[in-house]
Amino acid sequence: MEIDSYPEITITDMLAIIRNTCELYMKYGARSSKKVDYFHEEIIKQLRTIFTDERYIVAQEYDVPSLNPSGKKKCDIVVLRDNIPVIVLPVKIIMTNYKQNKNNYFENQIGEVTGIKLANPTINVIPLNIYMSKTPYLNTNKVITKFESITYSDIAIYEKYKEHRLFSDVINYIIDVEHENVVNETYQKIPKLIGFNNATGYVSLRAIMERLNV
């Protein structure tokens, strides 16, 4: 694959995308797909500047063959070469209540990826996960009951699956933040994004794609 020399997403660009994603979450709520759709679209825009050859297509919400009861899995972002999926990016953006749902997030993702890899042994799976260093835990009324700290140790297990080649690479970003809201307040203010945590430094999509043989 020849990488084209289009401008890549910088650290500043990515932080702006994440900030806009947070704004959409606050405006439309957790159940709305707007924040996820926006984030996916921004990543797809970048991938389309990388995979410019007409053999490649970058798709959103694409059904990839999977060893599961339905025989397929709808994947967030997929790169196809000659109409065959060659890269899958499962995306997760964690806004609240992470540690309560941590095992479910991980086990669901591993199960989905395993089915995809069994049906497509040579496919490249690259999870893209966004976390906040300080994540609010909300009750059913969206009131903050506490803040949870997320550190690299919470997500280090992903590297084990990379070592065993279930993942071709892993994009885990912890964003250092300062929250405007405090405990016992309704969560309704966008946190201030300080930057990428030192443990999960920013790497451009272009650099990651250059490592793949697709």
Which residues fall in each region the model found?
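Nuclease-adjacent, charged terminal/linker segments that flank catalytic cores
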Residues: 1-16, 22, 202, 208-214
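Acidic-basic catalytic patches of nuclease active cores, encompassing PD-(D/E)XK
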Residues: 7-62
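Phosphate/oxyanion-binding active-site loops and adjacent basic polyanion-contact surfaces
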Residues: 32-40, 70, 101, 105
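Hydrophobic, Leu/Ile/Phe/Ala-enriched alpha-helical segments that form helix-helix packing faces
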Residues: 39, 43-51, 113-120, 150-162, ...
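Charged, often glycine-rich, active-site loop that binds/positions anionic groups
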Residues: 61-77
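Active-site beta-strand-loop-beta-strand hairpin of nuclease catalytic cores
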Residues: 78-89
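Catalytic cores of nucleic-acid endonucleases
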Residues: 93-146
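Non-catalytic C-terminal interaction segments of nucleic acid-processing enzymes
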Residues: 144-214
